[in-house]
């Protein structure tokens, strides 16, 4: 649904303003989205581009669906994910791209817990090198 709405220039323009102002309400923020590093905050000090193999993503999504009592085949889920990726990469407004200064992280073999731990370590090192302080770690 979000991927289809993101194709609308009018919708994106409204969201961009909101998203750019959101971190100003706190002392920084961690934002997640397919155009956060390319459109919303192209000058962010740290950017990650997290990816995973399509089949791995489909299996993970299947597990999420099963937890809420929904049943879909891995093949059907993979087809939907592939369609979403293609749509997001090729849309005219805010396409999904990996910025040259982003740290690419393939999470095909790792868990979310490991990803979170490694990203926090990278952020802490970067902030320390910039003389900045992390206020709240979760």
Label every PLM stretch briefly.
Residues 41-65:
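C-terminal extensions
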Residues 1-27, 55, 59, 72-92, ...:
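ATP-dependent small-molecule kinase phosphotransfer cores
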Residues 21-24, 39-42, 94-98:
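Conserved catalytic network of the ASCE P-loop NTPase/AAA+ motor domain
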Residues 29, 45-49, 102-104:
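Short, well-ordered beta-strand core segments
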Residues 62-68, 87-138:
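NTP-dependent small-molecule kinase module
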Residues 1, 37-40:
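RNA pseudouridine synthases
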Residues 33-35, 52:
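A short beta-strand-to-loop transition that corresponds to the Sensor-1 phosphate-sensing loop
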